[in-house]
């Protein structure tokens, strides 16, 4: 677990703001592994760490997308905030300057998912929360400490990855793989509706390799 300014933001968001709960039942932080993502999508850069795909409020019985909300996305003007976001939540398909100027990826994620928790978190709080939750777990270092190390030719069973992430976060994750080549491309970490505790993801989309039950972690 990391200590950072955004970790302090997390405590403020959870305990001081006292947001209204009930519009969503759980929250999923979706982290993507850039190496695998960029094997199937042209990228401008490939960070050697997990990056944020999105922070998705959801319900167990239905999927929440493009919810009605008073606040639409407005471009982030603060340069420090843009730097913080780009470090943790970059658009891998565009150059840094373009990403920060046009903010298409952040706009898409907020309009599709962030508006579904707007009764609890405004736009600024939503992005702060996503970054703080990512910083809460140094997932790559933790996986390495448990013997799961990315690299060319590295393979692990789905069960080992699931159980290891359970040890790290206290909840079973949502694993996604690229089709065909079975590379681990995303890890979803689920939180309760108050975003205080990690829970088992309600609808885990685990990777389903054939034969050896191993998936690649490139």
Curated annotation (Swiss-Prot):
Its main location: secreted. Its EC number is 4.6.1.19. It comes from the Eukaryota. One of its GO terms (cellular component) is extracellular region. Glycans are attached at residues 49, 59, 162. It is an enzyme of class 4 (lyase). The active site is at residues 53, 109, 113. The keyword Lyase applies. Residues 1-22 form the signal peptide. It catalyses: a ribonucleotidyl-ribonucleotide-RNA + H2O = a 3'-end 3'-phospho-ribonucleotide-RNA + a 5'-end dephospho-ribonucleoside-RNA + H(+). Keywords: Disulfide bond, Endonuclease, Glycoprotein, Hydrolase, Lyase, Nuclease, Secreted, Signal. InterPro entries: Ribonuclease_T2_eukaryotic, RNase_T2-like, RNase_T2-like_sf, RNase_T2_His_AS_1, RNase_T2_His_AS_2. GO terms for biological process: RNA catabolic process. GO terms for molecular function: ribonuclease T2 activity; RNA binding. Disulfide bonds join 38-43, 67-116, 177-207, 190-201. It holds the Pfam family Ribonuclease_T2. RNA binds at residues 32, 53, 91-92, 105, 108-109, 112-113. It is found in: Secreted, Extracellular space. Self-incompatibility (SI) is the inherited ability of a flowering plant to prevent self-fertilization by discriminating between self and non-self pollen during pollination. In many species of the Solanaceae, self-incompatibility is controlled by the single, multiallelic locus S. This stylar glycoprotein is associated with expression of self-incompatibility in potato. Belongs to the RNase T2 family. This is Ribonuclease S-7.
């Amino acid at each position: 677990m990391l200590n950072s300014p955004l970790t302090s933001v997390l405590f403020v968001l959870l305990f001081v703001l006292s947001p209204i709960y009930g519009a969503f039942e759980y929250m999923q932080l979706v982290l993507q592994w850039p190496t695998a993502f960029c094997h199937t999508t042209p990228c401008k850069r490939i960070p050697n760490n997990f990056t944020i795909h999105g922070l998705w409020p959801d319900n167990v019985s239905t999927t929440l997308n493009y919810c009605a909300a008073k606040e639409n996305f407005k471009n982030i003007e603060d340069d420090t905030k843009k730097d913080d976001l780009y470090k943790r939540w970059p658009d891998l398909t565009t150059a840094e300057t373009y990403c920060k100027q046009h903010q298409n990826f952040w706009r898409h994620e907020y309009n599709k998912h962030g508006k579904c928790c707007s009764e609890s978190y405004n736009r600024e709080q939503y992005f702060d929360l996503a970054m703080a939750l990512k910083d809460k777990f140094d997932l790559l270092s933790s996986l390495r400490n448990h013997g799961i190390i990315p690299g060319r030719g590295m393979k692990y069973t789905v069960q080992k990855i699931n159980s290891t992430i359970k040890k790290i976060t206290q909840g079973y994750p949502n694993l996604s793989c690229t089709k065909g080549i079975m590379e681990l491309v995303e890890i979803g970490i689920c939180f309760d509706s108050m975003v205080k505790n990690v829970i088992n993801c309600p609808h885990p989309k685990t990777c389903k390799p054939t034969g050896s039950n191993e998936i690649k972690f490139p």
